[in-house]
Amino acid sequence: MAKPATILVKLESTADTGYFYVVKKNPRKTTNKLEFNKYDPRVRKHVPFRETKLK
């Protein structure tokens, strides 16, 4: 069987609240780490979320 094209990665809040999103990423096309501005409900603001390894 072939390897799947996408992997799951965790986007963790930079506000140190512990809040995170799990998203799919194609490592062949996107070699850099992902960073998005998303909503963190624990601080009730949009903050940067950075990619970390999903354990």
From Swiss-Prot:
* UniProt-recorded Gene Ontology molecular function terms: structural constituent of ribosome
One short Pfam family name for this protein?
Ribosomal_L33
Q: Which Gene3D superfamilies match?
A: Ribosomal protein L33
Q: Name one GO cellular component term.
A: cytoplasm
Disulfide linkage: none
Keyword Ribonucleoprotein on entry: yes
Q: Does the keyword Ribosomal protein apply?
A: yes
The alphabetical list of record keywords is:
Ribonucleoprotein, Ribosomal protein
Give the family per the record. Belongs to the bacterial ribosomal protein bL33 family.
Under NCBIfam families, the record lists: PRK00595.1 (NF001860), rpmG_bact (TIGR01023)
> What protein name does the entry list?
Large ribosomal subunit protein bL33
Native organism: Rhodospirillum rubrum (strain ATCC 11170 / ATH 1.1.1 / DSM 467 / LMG 4362 / NCIMB 8255 / S1)
Gene transcribed to yield this protein? rpmG
